[in-house]
Amino acid sequence: MTRTPRIAYISTFVPKRCGLATYTHHLREAVLLAKGKRREGGFPAAVPPPDPVVCLCHAEETGQYSLPWQIPLVKQRREDYRAIAQRINASSVDVVSLQHEFGIFGGVAGEYVLELLRHLEKPVVTTFHTVFAQPSPPHTDVQREIAALSSHLLVMNRLAIDDLRGQLRVPAWKISYIPHGAPVPPQEDRTRKRREYGW
């Protein structure tokens, strides 16, 4: 039997109150379920879960990420980005899922993420959560290099495909559109909510 690929996620992550953190949490949970992991009490049954998350955070938040599969990355420590790349390279991770939003990474326009990408030896699939229709430096330069260093790009807005192709000259074969989606609440939550609203 062949094993399922191991994915390392790079993003903000819960308990941080951030849309990207919530998105990555739900994405990881859905992938674990698709890979056949059972949920118990809302958490994957595998201990520790196989897919690590590099959790972007501030120095004072690192203690929030203490589970064995959580790897805190202090966003303003440039040297830590290379160390994370080396750690992923030495692991059994097969692919990296980078969730990109300019504000979550350190440096000008989030440029520190480039330090990580330049040293990664694993394939990277980057989800661009923001693509500017009229990009300008330094955002253009950072996003162009991220695109060049990524094996594939995902966007959740069809218009972003044309923006990446036109402004950044990314080839069409390298970009895929996926709908953002939303988590499906458990049946008991739906039933309770319906009662609360008198349905």
Task: Name what the model sees in each region.
Residues 1-71, 91, 150:
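N-terminal subdomain of nucleotide-sugar transferases
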Residues 115-119, 137-153:
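Membrane-proximal helix-turn-helix segments that form the acceptor-binding/catalytic region
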Residues 159, 181:
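Carbohydrate-associated surface elements
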Residues 163-166:
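Phosphate- and divalent-cation-binding pockets in alpha/beta enzyme and binding domains
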Residues 101-105, 122-138, 152:
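A short, histidine- and acid-enriched strand-loop-helix "catalytic/donor-clamping" loop
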Residues 186-199:
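A short helix/loop element that forms part of the nucleotide-sugar donor recognition site in Leloir-type
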